[in-house]
Regions:
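Conserved Rossmann-fold NAD(P)-dependent oxidoreductase catalytic core, especially the SDR/UDP-sugar
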Residues: 68-113, 139
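Adenosine-cofactor binding site in Rossmann-like domains, unifying the SAM/SAH pocket
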Residues: 4-30
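SDR active-site strand-loop-helix element
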Residues: 14, 39-45, 82-88, 141-143
Length: 192
């Protein structure tokens, strides 16, 4: 969206209802038709602690399906450049702070979002493996937690910060004296 806003001329996007990224045949047809110079893979099934913990199978299956479909279809369509957005949750639960890239796979993952994290780690490895085998330029970026316009503020499905904002707004609106926040207050979050 930002690239379109900046008036880039050849930016192709599709909504979830326009193109199911889990469907490799449709993704390959789409990429073969538009022949992009690069693909930015930011799509994922995401959610907060409650969603990650109760929809574990959906999170790992859908994310692996999206990643495998888009990355492999990009290769088949001749796309040499791809950016894959990973997640900060790929790092160990008890990782030293601030988190460094070398801490990846150095400890246990947070159990509540382990299926999502494992899918993201698999996507990183898939990009690295395709780079080696097929001489591609597939890069993996690990953004910190982002929030803002079009975020999901649902108290069950959203990530920590949007949920916190909603709780504070609701507390002010309904004149509540306190808000309830899950956890023990020790986890650190990086936000943009």
């Amino acid at each position: 969206r930002k690239l379109e806003e900046l008036k880039y001329k050849k930016v192709f996007t599709r909504s979830k209802k326009d193109l199911d990224l889990r469907d490799q045949k449709k993704v390959l047809k789409y990429l073969s038709t538009i022949k992009p110079d690069a693909v930015i893979l930011a799509a994922a099934k995401v959610g907060g602690i409650e969603a990650n913990n109760t929809l574990r199978g959906e999170f790992i299956y859908d994310n692996l399906s999206i990643q495998n479909s888009v990355i492999h279809s990009s290769y088949l369509a001749g796309v040499k450049n791809l950016i894959f957005l990973g997640s900060s949750c790929i790092y160990p639960k008890l990782s030293k702070q601030p988190i460094k890239e070398k801490y990846l796979l150095s400890g246990y993952l947070e159990k509540t979002n382990e299926p999502y994290a494992i899918a993201k780690i698999a996507g990183i490895n898939l990009c690295e493996s395709y780079n080696i085998q097929y001489n591609l330029n597939y890069k993996c970026l690990m953004p910190c937690n982002a929030y803002g316009i079009n975020d999901d503020y649902d108290p069950i499905k959203s990530h920590f910060f949007p949920a916190l904002i909603k709780k504070i707004v609701d507390a002010i609106r309904y004149r509540k004296k306190a808000i309830y926040i899950w956890g023990n207050g020790k986890p650190l979050r990086e936000l943009i």
